[in-house]
Amino acid sequence: MLLSDPTPLITVPVIPVVTIARAADAIPLARALLAGGLNVIEITLRTPDALDAARAIIAEVPDIIVGIGTVIRPLDVIHAVDAGADFLVSPGTPASLIQALADAPVPALPGCATVSEAMTLAAFGFPVLKFFPAESSGGVRWLKAVVEPLPEIRFCPTGGVNGDNAASYIAL
């Protein structure tokens, strides 16, 4: 399910971020998420099977929007797009990665942890940013403070969001 813009990513309340050790586990996981009402998934590039897992979900569970995360190098952008990613997610944005994400044919959620990073990424045309690591960077209080002067930017908080604090993030 290819996205031409990131709008669906800001309308879902939760994007599960998963690290899949074995590609064989990908399809059952995706089907379980879909059955539970979650149609977006971010697969991290933290295992050798990550891209194969993404390819399997894209081929077998077409109703899931598949993002590839932990994109940290321009080469990761190429591999993720070649695998069929619907969107890309990075934990941070070194200068070498910003342009690669901006040039990608799919939406990207580049990572930020400061107001300056958020403003820089917005200037590059990114309307949705990954706020990472959310909890240790100020969490809900940071988001409330930043959204006021920067209402045009949407944030996807990740890192430290769990069952104890998720409701406060979803309420934003």
Where are each of the predicted segments found?
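Conserved anion-binding
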Residues: 49, 72-171
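Conserved N-terminal beta1-alpha1 strand-loop-helix module at the mouth
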Residues: 1-86, 93, 103, 152, ...
